[in-house]
């Protein structure tokens, strides 16, 4: 059995701000049946320690970036959880990355360097008579680990860095080299220096044995200037060691309340009632998203007439950019077929995916995306931009896709308002072709969106790395 330590800054069900947490939480169970024994290392935030009360201390660390720390043992479902209990770094009010003022904690570089140091310590010395063969590092927060492994003289433990979102690069000023206990001779363009600053993400990309991201298309995109956000050259240099493995979803946690597409009707009616939308002979489209430009929702505002003029409706759940919040509120006030709920409500999001006919994901870039996978699972047809994981998970209702009977949704490209308008018009036209729509719903609900294929891909990669 390959021994793997997953090093992450967040993990469901303990703490979550984004999709990274879903992957970190799902992989241990998904890999258990693939011959991989994965354990997880997390920072000791209050929520994590609270869920693992009175856990045994496995290791004392006298000084870890300004204070004492301990490695504790907990549980993550059936998987072993290691907790880095460092109160001076993690026991504080606010979010896990942001303070109560909404700004990054100024000591974030030290906080997550500590996580990397703890991972390197476990790799070097083991814990509980267990020592990993592979460290699975998630995003910049775990990116310095390969450097600390080098410093510890560890040569027999391999590292995989998974990039969940290239936009977060773990930048710190150069004067922090000493504070972060980093070797000055690696602070150069071939190392972890990035435009005069330290980049923890670049450190991981350059020094990890392998690099992955969360979909094959996003892997290709990241090696281009349009999507690479300055890291495209570094990733292109690692192209032979860089791969894309799709995320999955927990099929038990996301189980539709109906077995066939016909079961959607009462949920659609209930959702219309909940949002105050009138009954109409058109598709009920839903958006469950952060309201940001990255998600392409400014384009949806511009393209909205195409949906409404063709009899469609829109229900939106989310929050984010104040300008977009105001734009959707204005649209809801003007049009009976548009409704908005600001904020996030997990139970409501599930009711929306169950009751909606289509889920709109017009993102400008999307590493993998989860909402379109939920839509497929529930027979709520995804309308998506042709980018990242959206391109890899939805089969377009093109003439060929419909003729072959394999379509599961609607894709559009390029990602602009005019093309989105045409896609919305096409979606509404398909709605009025009941046989085609029914076939697409059947295809969507049968489409494999769980972790099985992804877990096999990770297991094969880990096994090859450990050999």
UniProtKB/Swiss-Prot annotation:
InterPro entries: Glyco_trans_1, GS/SS, Starch_synth_cat_dom. It holds the Pfam family Glycos_transf_1. It catalyses: [(1->4)-alpha-D-glucosyl](n) + ADP-alpha-D-glucose = [(1->4)-alpha-D-glucosyl](n+1) + ADP + H(+). Pathway: Glycan biosynthesis; glycogen biosynthesis. One of its GO terms (molecular function) is alpha-1,4-glucan glucosyltransferase (ADP-glucose donor) activity. GO terms for biological process: glycogen biosynthetic process. It is an enzyme of class 2 (transferase). ADP-alpha-D-glucose binds at residue 16. Keywords: Glycogen biosynthesis, Glycosyltransferase, Transferase. Belongs to the glycosyltransferase 1 family. Bacterial/plant glycogen synthase subfamily. Synthesizes alpha-1,4-glucan chains using ADP-glucose. This is Glycogen synthase.
